[in-house]
Amino acid sequence: MKIALYAGSFDPLTNGHLDILKASFVLADKVIVAIGIQAKKESLFSFEERVDLITQAGKELLNMGSDRLQVISFETLLIDKAREIGASFLIRGLRDGTDLDYEMQMAGMNGLMAPELQTVFLPAGVLGRVITSTLVRQIASMGGDVAPFVPANVARALHLKFQSSRGSDCVS
């Protein structure tokens, strides 16, 4: 069984992430989405919320059975988690040349430390090339419509998250 490991923060999951996830299923029997947990990095969504959002979007939009998609966390080196779960290869999405430069450095280091693990680069679709989780969070925080950039369940979750924070900023 070919197992792909697709790692990121997914805070929030975007349609660009889903494009890469969907393409991963062409190459792998199972895709494990690994959410990186960094104590120093403050996330908008908790790990549990991100698991739910990814799982729901994966099932709804990708029409995949739950046995082909798994969501886990990791706080170690990615290669250590990949070895632990028996991953066949790592998946990395590319939006542009800047991503390629960074990802080639990471793949090089990973290859030196874990030569048995290959990194597979998947190009983002045309619409996914301009989407970043950071931009989506900024748009949502200002009350903008993020529906074109994220799955419907994520758009709802962002709306609720920022609606409650904007409501608490109001002065009576």
Swiss-Prot record:
**Site positions per UniProt: Transition state stabilizer:** H17
- Which family does this protein fall into? Belongs to the bacterial CoaD family.
* UniProt entry keywords in alphabetical sequence: ATP-binding, Coenzyme A biosynthesis, Cytoplasm, Magnesium, Nucleotide-binding, Nucleotidyltransferase, Transferase
In its keyword annotation, does this UniProt entry include Calcium? no
Could you name the domain of life of the organism this protein comes from? Bacteria
Q: Where does ATP bind?
A: S9, F10, H17, G93, L94, R95, E103, G128, R129, V130, I131, T132, S133, T134
What does the record give as the function of this protein? Reversibly transfers an adenylyl group from ATP to 4'-phosphopantetheine, yielding dephospho-CoA (dPCoA) and pyrophosphate.
Listed EC numbers: 2.7.7.3
Do you know which InterPro entries this protein is assigned to?
A: Cyt_trans-like, PPAT, Rossmann-like_a/b/a_fold
Q: Which residues bind substrate?
A: S9, K41, L78, R92
Q: Which HAMAP family match?
A: PPAT_bact (MF_00151)
Entry's Gene Ontology cellular component terms: cytoplasm
Q: Report the protein name in the record.
A: Phosphopantetheine adenylyltransferase
Q: Which cofactor does it need?
A: Mg(2+)
Its ancestry begins with:
Bacteria, Pseudomonadati, Pseudomonadota, Alphaproteobacteria, Hyphomicrobiales
State the pathway, as annotated in the record: Cofactor biosynthesis; coenzyme A biosynthesis; CoA from (R)-pantothenate: step 4/5
| Subunit structure comment from the entry | Homohexamer.
Q: What GO MF annotations does this protein's record show?
A: ATP binding; pantetheine-phosphate adenylyltransferase activity
Record organism: Bartonella henselae (strain ATCC 49882 / DSM 28221 / CCUG 30454 / Houston 1) (Rochalimaea henselae)
